[in-house]
Swiss-Prot record:
Designated name of the protein: tRNA pseudouridine synthase A
Keyword DNA damage in record: no
Protein task: Formation of pseudouridine at positions 38, 39 and 40 in the anticodon stem and loop of transfer RNAs.
Active site, renumbered: D53 (nucleophile)
One GO-annotated biological process of the protein: tRNA pseudouridine synthesis
Region forming the signal peptide: none
Length: 282
C-alpha cells in the first residue's frame, strides 16, 4: 500500500534531500527513511515531490512510500497511519517535522502526479542583515536593489522555455520547464526593512534553477547586469558561467499542487510521457 507524507524541514544542517548511496552524510531522506524503517520494522524508500539542494528548506514538502499492510499492524499504530505523526515526533530531530501521514489515494505519485511546485526566496539588503530569528531562512545581499527592474527581468522568463542556462548539468535530463509565476514582493516591516521575497512557481524545476533565476534578477536589480540579461540567457544552449546562483539559505519549498483524486493516475502518466518525449529526457 502507498502512504503519503506531508513534512517540513530546516535545510541548514542537511546535505540536501537525497540519500547519498551508502554514505553517512546527513540528508533529509536518510533521516526519514532510517526512522520510518525503525518504526515500521521494514525498509522504506521515499519518493519526493521536490528534491531540494543542500541548505534549502521546505514548509510544504510531499513524499510517498510503499509498505506491506502488515507493517502498519504495530501495537502503537494499529493500522492507522495517522498515528505515525506522534511516533515520528518523538524520534525525529527538531529540524524535521512530519505533520501528515495518510493512505495515498489510488494513482497518487508524490513526484509525477504533481501539477506545480511553489518556492519562496527570502532576501534582505539591509546592512545589518536578517533578524536573528530568521537568519537561517533569509539570505543577505550586499547591495541595494531596484525591485521593479527585477520584476521586469523576471517577466520575460514566464512560459515554456529551455532553461539550460539556469540549470546545472545532469546527464540525460531535460531542462525544458514551464515557469508559471515569478513575482517579486517588497515585504519590509519596521523590524525587517529592505526585505524582499520572490515567489516562483513551475510544473517542475531542474537542479539549481530557482536559485539561478533569483540570482540573475538580483544582478539586474543591483545594476551589475543590463535589463535584457535574463532575456539573453534564454537564448543560451548550455549552462552559462555568467549566471549568479543565490545562496541556498533563502530558498524554501512552500507547496505542491495536485489534481483531484480521480485525475492523479492520468496526471502521473502524462508527466512521465512528456518527460520522456522531451529532448534529453530519460
Amino acid at each position: 500500500m502507498r502512504i503519503r507524507l506531508d513534512l517540513d524541514y530546516d535545510g541548514t544542517d542537511f546535505h540536501g534531500w537525497a540519500r547519498q548511496g551508502d554514505s553517512d552524510l546527513r540528508t533529509v531522506q536518510k533521516v526519514l527513511e532510517d526512522n520510518l524503517g525503525m518504526v515500521l520494522r521494514a525498509p522504506v524508500e521515499l519518493t519526493v515531490a521536490g528534491r531540494t539542494d543542500a541548505g534549502v528548506h521546505a514548509a510544504g514538502q510531499v513524499a510517498h512510500f510503499d509498505i506491506p499492510r502488515e507493517s502498519l499492524q504495530q501495537r502503537s499504530i494499529d493500522g492507522d497511519p495517522t498515528k505515525l505523526v506522534r511516533r515520528l515526533s518523538r524520534l525525529l530531530p527538531e529540524d524535521i517535522r512530519v505533520h501528515g501521514v495518510n493512505y495515498a489515494p489510488e494513482g497518487f505519485d508524490a513526484r509525477f502526479s504533481a501539477l506545480r511546485r511553489h518556492y519562496v526566496y527570502r532576501i534582505t539588503t539591509h546592512p545589518a542583515g536578517p533578524l536573528p530569528t530568521r537568519v537561517r531562512d533569509t539570505a543577505a545581499w550586499p547591495k541595494p536593489v531596484d525591485i521593479q527592474a527585477m520584476q521586469t527581468a523576471a517577466d520575460v522568463l514566464i512560459g515554456l522555455h529551455d532553461f539550460v542556462a539556469f540549470c546545472k548539468a545532469k546527464p540525460n535530463a531535460s531542462t525544458v520547464r514551464e515557469l508559471q509565476e515569478f513575482t517579486w514582493h517588497d515585504v519590509s516591516t519596521p523590524t525587517e526593512p529592505q526585505l524582499y521575497e520572490a515567489h516562483v512557481v513551475a510544473d517542475a524545476f531542474c537542479w539549481s534553477m530557482v536559485r539561478s533565476l533569483v540570482g540573475s534578477c538580483m544582478a539586474v536589480g543591483e545594476g551589475r547586469r543590463a535589463g535584457d540579461f535574463t532575456a539573453q540567457l534564454l537564448t543560451a544552449t548550455e549552462r552559462s558561467p555568467d549566471v549568479p546562483v543565490a545562496p541556498a539559505k533563502g530558498l524554501s519549498l512552500v507547496g505542491v499542487d495536485y489534481p483531484d483524486d480521480d485525475q492523479l493516475r492520468a496526471r502521473a502518466e502524462e508527466t512521465r510521457a512528456v518527460r520522456g518525449a522531451l529532448p534529453g529526457a530519460p
